[in-house]
């Protein structure tokens, strides 16, 4: 009996995981930027440092860039520059360049639908004026991780001015593959060293149709019944009014080739300039 107990205790206390990895051996990918230049994909991986910065006591990040004729080879090229195993299931953000949304959007959707290494609940945005690589390398002492600063900007604007389209990748997928529904998502740029949400990129199926500015974003959110107290400035007869919409609903229908919008919106005047 004693021998059996000794064997059981030995098995319990001495077992381990055969595929165990030290954290220092892993490269945790926090964000991905995708560009297309000179007939090649350019992948920028934002990687979290495995050690806290001694001076600031903050977690920082760095980037690695890979090139390839397809997305997989570009990612592998970036991975070859690291002596670590890439971990993609912590991704929080993906940024697409103008050339990608214009010509390679369907390839992006296809890759991430097929690849089980990537999770689908990360924010998905475009950057039609600034390269994704430049965005993910824009860090400061206050914001040592660029993707975190971008996400903070996305979320804060969503709850304040209502001028962005905050969507996860799985939402984009659902819209793209659903007949009769076209997708859209926020566009970002870098201006005066600040991340600025610059309207939204819109699509017809997989085809990029262009960008709409922030005022159109507010209208889109009203039409889709997805608004939270947006404000509008109305200029009339040399007067200026700022009106906030509290609640209500708009209905849209197509009749004889014409789009009709009707409904009721309740709001209040926040400010006026006589």
List the model feature ranges, each with a label:
Residues 2-6, 13-274:
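Membrane-proximal alpha-helical signals and transmembrane carboxylates
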